[in-house]
Every structure is written in structure tokens, then in C-alpha cells.
A protein has these predicted regions:
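Membrane-interface helix-loop-helix junctions at transmembrane boundaries of multi-pass membrane enzymes
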Residues: 8-12, 222-241, 324-364, 410-415
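Hydrophobic alpha-helical membrane-interfacial segments at the cytosolic entry of transmembrane helices
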Residues: 15-24, 190-191, 229-256, 272-277, ...
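Membrane-embedded helix bundles of polyisoprenyl
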Residues: 23, 112-131, 135-221, 240-247, ...
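Membrane-interface coil-to-helix junctions
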Residues: 27-120, 148-163, 276-304, 356-370, ...
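Signature aromatic-anchored transmembrane alpha helix within multi-pass, membrane-resident enzymes
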Residues: 237-249, 395, 401-433
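Membrane-lumen/periplasm interface segments of specific transmembrane helices
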Residues: 241-274, 279-300
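Extracytoplasmic
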Residues: 266-276, 424-570
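Hydrophobic/aromatic-rich transmembrane helices and adjacent perimembrane loops
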Residues: 315-318, 365-404
Length: 570
């Protein structure tokens, strides 16, 4: 282990640039034709990608226009801290400064989606290289982390796909300590802080992982130091303390608005009922997303038995799993590292099961995280831990690929080993592909990329605050995206929980326009109500029991703007 610690590999800047370019090209190819439809199409579906496009746009808008009121977004007006109703992707704020309007928001989301994939590949590659994998085997690690089949279902969850900061932070910290470079250590904590700013779904995992690794390192140093064999340069200790304080400060600052939301909105808390709903059975690890080229149809019978498919399809990939098992025996990694990665993957898989309210599932270890450790009560989906499971498997898969190629090299020479390396990389990539055979009438269809609905031309420039109807979930998602044209304050919004205030407001306006609903909206300060006649009524809207009234009798000015019926409340 000591010899391995002293043998940090040479990684040239040229190598990093080439791998980054290759990762970007691979992202474009695997998710083609998305790159040909930037700004008009969006990955996977018209669900969460629309409000997440709005989130990044708001981040840039808020930084430029109201930095002291960053979390006071235009959704769910007049509620406070409404940006903190879900992971806010604050780490992407610089991207939000570029461009304006719905088209720019969708272009931005499409590019960030591809960027997240490429960064995950690059991060796992660099970490595998630092651990001792040769370049081509590290490429297998990059593909295994970025292309794991379960990630195909996360196309609408940019905060989950954006995991590249985790391996990059670990790479910088490990390399900084091995090469005794204080700047690299601080850089590692800076990247960890950026990952935290993308959302607590993954940031919390990384924070606890760093605490665990720090504790292991401290124990190792204490045991080795008892014999006087280990001395730590002061500058490394200072860099670690400074970096740790930076990460802690960023985490605390980001947590404050979320804590205020929990205090103001008890319905935002992740109850045991909610967590158990998104926890899953063991079979979810053999359920691949429907969009998986290799495993989508093969695992459909298992997938159909799951209650929350987007959160419970956690299949890591058969090729990745077999390579990871082989990697447990690769001597290029020191034995403690191999054992640690294997144990870590198993422990995380167990934690990913979450827990159930009753029965034997109520004793699963995730309950300990939920009940005893700070932060975990804010996590809705235990399966998000699959990100770290996949990283551990990817690093072991690099070892398995290196072991297989070495065996071929000793028997059949270098050419066979090269072919083996390329074949294994291709196998992992194909297994994680989202192309579909005979999908939607196409012989070979690309990863789903629906066209984004455009805003009606009469929507821009209306007096705010406003309410848009109907207000079904899918409607509110598109309203948020359309609101990036000026960010008018509005009652509508979309988040991971349903604010009690909004439910009350929808009940109060069920009969709009009538005297009670108009009086309610005027008391709030709403100035405009927009009815989208081109959209179907919300089937879940509260029923009207009294009937509406003529607008002129209520002091309303009604105008028609194409498909929009606009009511000016005065």
C-alpha cells in the first residue's frame, strides 16, 4: 500500500484534453439527434426537464438582477424561498447568465445535459487513472460511470446526472495528497463545493463520503505514525482545513433557505411514508429503463412490477458488473483498495433499498441514516445512492478490463490485448445506449427528445402577478419555462412537493370567474388571469359547485389573444 501511495501516475494536460473531447463526442453520438435540435427538443420527456430549464435560467437572472433575493423566485408567488422548493442547480448559475427567454433556456438545458454526461466520463477516467488504471482501462471506468443503463431514466433529473464533480473532487484530493500539492487539495474541496451547489441529492452523499474517507485516512495515519514512519507536511494540513471550511461554509449557506422552507412548509418534509414509497425491492437492481437498447425489453416484466419506475430502475449493467467482479482480483490496485471498493459497492446497494414502514423492510440500514444523521430527512429517494455504487463498480470495472487484457497479452500478444480493450469499452457503451430498435415507427430511434411546446405569442408582457389556468402539473411545467421571458411573478409553479397554499388557491379559484374567486385573487394582489383555451381542463382540479359570473359584473376586463383568454383584475 505504501508503494502504491508513492506511485501517483503522470497525467499530461494533453491526455486530459483528448479524453474530454472524446467524452463530449461520445455524448453527442449516444444522444443523437438531440444535438441537431438544440433549443427545440429536450431529453427524455416534457416533465422535469422543463422546470429544470427554468431553474438554471432563474439562477442566472437572479444573480444578475437580485443577488440578495436569489431564492425569491417568480414561481408560487407570494411564497418566500420558492427556489429552494427543490434542488436548484445553483452550480450552473454561470450558464444561466448566457441568453434569455424559453429558447435559450432549452438550449442551455440540452447543452448541460450533454456536459453532465461528458464530465461524468472524464471524472471517472481521471480517478481511475490516479488509482493506477492504464488509460484504456480508465476509459472503461469513464464509460461505466457515465453510461450505466440506470442513468437513461434520469434524463429529466439533471441534478442526478450531474455527478462528474464527485470523481473529480476525489481525484484532486487524492492526487494532491500523494504529490503533496496544497493547491490541488483546495481545488478538490472547491469542486466538492460546486457539486454541493448542484443539489443536496448528490452533494449530501459526497459530504458524508469525504467524512468517511477522512476518518479512514486519520486512522491509517495514527496507526502508521505510532512507529514514527509518517510525517505530514504542514501545508497539506492547512490546505485540508481551508478546503474543508470552504465546503462547510458553502453547505451551510445553501442549506439555510431549505431549512426555512421546512419550517414554513411542513408538507415539504420527507416523511417515512414518502421515503418508503420511493424505496424499492431487491429486484429493482435488475430492472433497466424502457429506453435501454439492450435491456429495456428484456427487463420489462420486472420493471412493470415497480411502483416508482424513474426512481427504482437501478440496473448497473451486466458488462459493468462482470468486469467489476473480475476487477476484485486485479493486482494493479492494492488489495485494501479492491476490498474497500467491493465492500463499499455492496453497502451502498443495501442502503439504496431504503426502508419500508412495516415488516422486515423496516429494519433496513437506510433507516439509520434517515433517523440519526443530519440532512438525510431531506432526501426523498434512497436510490440516488446508486450514483456512488456505480462509481465504485466503474473503478473496479477498469481493473477487470485491465486484467482481461493482460491475460490476452500474455497468451496472444499485444494486438489481441488492444482488440480486447476496444471491445470491452464498446460493450459497456452499447449496453448503456438509449437507442431503440423499432421504436415509434423508426427502425433505429435515438434517445427520446420530444419537441418543447412554444409559448402563445399573446402571453408576453401581461401584467404580473398572474395566474395561469388550467394548472395541472404538466401545465405548470410549461408555464415555468415560458416565464423565462421576463420572469413575471405568478401563482403557478412546479416542485417536488405540493405547497398547501397552492392547493388552497386552486380550490378558491375553482369557479373563476365568480365573485369569491375574484375577491380572493384581488386580496392576494393578482392582476391578471390567463386561461389557455388550447389546453385540456385539469382532471384533478377542485370541482366548481356554484358556477361563474359575467366578467363585466365583476369589474373584469376580458380580452382574447389567440388561444388565450385574458382577464385583467384591475
Amino acid at each position: 500500500m505504501a508503494a502504491w501511495w508513492r506511485s501517483s501516475p503522470q497525467i499530461r494536460g494533453r491526455e486530459v484534453v483528448l479524453v474530454a473531447l472524446a467524452a463530449a463526442l461520445l455524448a453527442v453520438v449516444l444522444f443523437w439527434p438531440l444535438a441537431a435540435h438544440l433549443g427545440t427538443d429536450i431529453p427524455l420527456d416534457l416533465g422535469d426537464p422543463l422546470p429544470q430549464s427554468w431553474q438554471v435560467a432563474w439562477d442566472g437572472h437572479a444573480l444578475a438582477t437580485q443577488p440578495l433575493g436569489f431564492f425569491q423566485s417568480n414561481q408560487f408567488w407570494p411564497l418566500h424561498d420558492s427556489l429552494a422548493f427543490s434542488d436548484a442547480l445553483i452550480g450552473y448559475t454561470p450558464a444561466g447568465l448566457i441568453g434569455h427567454g424559453p429558447h435559450a433556456a432549452v438550449v442551455r438545458y440540452d447543452l448541460l445535459f450533454l456536459f453532465a454526461f461528458a464530465l461524468a466520463f472524464l471524472g471517472a477516467y481521471l480517478l481511475a487513472r490516479e488509482l493506477g488504471a492504464p488509460p484504456w482501462a480508465a476509459a472503461v471506468a469513464g464509460a461505466a460511470f457515465a453510461c450505466a443503463p440506470w442513468r437513461l431514466e434520469q434524463g429529466g433529473h439533471l441534478h442526478v446526472l450531474s455527478s462528474g464533480g464527485i470523481p473529480i473532487a476525489l481525484f484532486l484530493l487524492l492526487r494532491g495528497w500523494r504529490r503533496e500539492r496544497a493547491g490541488m487539495i483546495v481545488g478538490g474541496f472547491a469542486v466538492a463545493s460546486w457539486q454541493m451547489a448542484l443539489g443536496f441529492s448528490l452533494g449530501l452523499q459526497l459530504g458524508y463520503l469525504l467524512l468517511l474517507l477522512g476518518a479512514i485516512a486519520a486512522i491509517w495515519w495514527w496507526r502508521a505514525g505510532r512507529g514514527g514512519r509518517v510525517g505530514i507536511p504542514r501545508r497539506l494540513i492547512v490546505a485540508t482545513i481551508v478546503g474543508g471550511l470552504l465546503l462547510t461554509a458553502v453547505s451551510l449557506v445553501l442549506a439555510r433557505p431549505y431549512m426555512r422552507v421546512l419550517d414554513a412548509h411542513p408538507e415539504a418534509k420527507r416523511s417515512q411514508v414518502t421515503v418508503s414509497r420511493y424505496s424499492g425491492p431487491l429486484r429493482m437492481f435488475v430492472a433497466a429503463p424502457e429506453t435501454s437498447l439492450v435491456w429495456g425489453r428484456a427487463t420489462s416484466s420486472v420493471r412493470d412490477t415497480l411502483d416508482a419506475v424513474p426512481e427504482q430502475t437501478l440496473f448497473p449493467g451486466l458488462a459493468i458488473l462482470l468486469l467489476a467482479i473480475a476487477g476484485l482480483g486485479w493486482t494493479g490496485y492494492p488489495r485494501p483498495l479492491r476490498v474497500g471498493l467491493g465492500a463499499f459497492a455492496l453497502a451502498l446497494a443495501l442502503l439504496s433499498l431504503g426502508f419500508q414502514e412495516h415488516g422486515i423492510g423496516s429494519f433496513l440500514p437506510y433507516r439509520l441514516l434517515y433517523e440519526a444523521l443530519p440532512g438525510w430527512q431531506g432526501i426523498r429517494v434512497p436510490g440516488r445512492l446508486n450514483t456512488l455504487t456505480t462509481l465504485a463498480l466503474a473503478l473496479l470495472a477498469a481493473g477487470g478490463a485491465a486484467r482481461a487484457a493482460a491475460a490476452l497479452r500474455s497468451r496472444r500478444g499485444g494486438s489481441a490485448a488492444t482488440v480486447c480493450a476496444a471491445a470491452l469499452l464498446l460493450l459497456v457503451v452499447i449496453e448503456g445506449s438509449g437507442f431503440g430498435i423499432d421504436r415509434g415507427g423508426e427502425a433505429l430511434a435515438g434517445y427520446p427528445h420530444p419537441t418543447v411546446p412554444t409559448a402563445p405569442p399573446g402571453l408576453a408582457g401581461l401584467r404580473a402577478p398572474l395566474l395561469q389556468l388550467p394548472a395541472a402539473r404538466e401545465d405548470n411545467r410549461r408555464y415555468l419555462l415560458w416565464s423565462t421571458d421576463g420572469f413575471p411573478k405568478m401563482l403557478n409553479g412546479r416542485t417536488s412537493f405540493d405547497p398547501t397554499f397552492f392547493a388552497h388557491a386552486m380550490k378558491a379559484v375553482a369557479c373563476f370567474p365568480d365573485r369569491a374567486s375574484v375577491a380572493f385573487l384581488r386580496r392576494l394582489g393578482v392582476r391578471t388571469v390567463v386561461v389557455h383555451s388550447e389546453l385540456p381542463p385539469d382532471p384533478e382540479a377542485p370541482a366548481c359547485t356554484t358556477g361563474s359570473a359575467a366578467p363585466e359584473k365583476l369589474g373584469l376586463q376580458r380580452t382574447r389573444r389567440g388561444p388565450l383568454v385574458v382577464y385583467d383584475l384591475g
